[in-house]
Amino acid sequence: MGLRLSEEKTKIVHIDEGFDFLGMHIQRHKKLGADRRFVYTYPSRAALAAVKAKVRTACRGTTNQSLSDLLKRLNPILRGWTNYHRHGAASKTFSYLTAFTWRRVWIWLRGKHPKATVKELRRRYLPGWHPQQDEVRMFYPDTVAIVRYRYRGAAIASPWATKDTAA
């Protein structure tokens, strides 16, 4: 039982070129305003394309249902994807996904009520330009906080440390 690497599945690249792994694109960049280079993890383009396809399919051909049913289908998709990708440099991607989803919901509303004016749609479904109905509100991915883990050094903090022993 030995380890064999498949040449079709294995790829060796330089970190400056970047690579995709588990839905993230990992690449080293020069930080703006600094001379040092840092490794960043972004959501990969394939992962973004996949979630956009899920949003499109959720909005396609369902105008016979209510807006709250659409939002109940969309919100778990968006929450799950953003919670998975919130540990990388994803704030611009989250803003883009928010705009994309809002646009798809707007197109869905225009298809559901083709003769309604923008003012009527806004009054009925978009209070403050936030899609909602029956206490169900659209989830905005750009409101998710980006959480990164800090390097703590070689010493791991003891969970049993008291104020006296921590010093």
Question: Language-model segments: which ranges?
Answer:
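Non-catalytic terminal/accessory segments
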Residues: 1-167
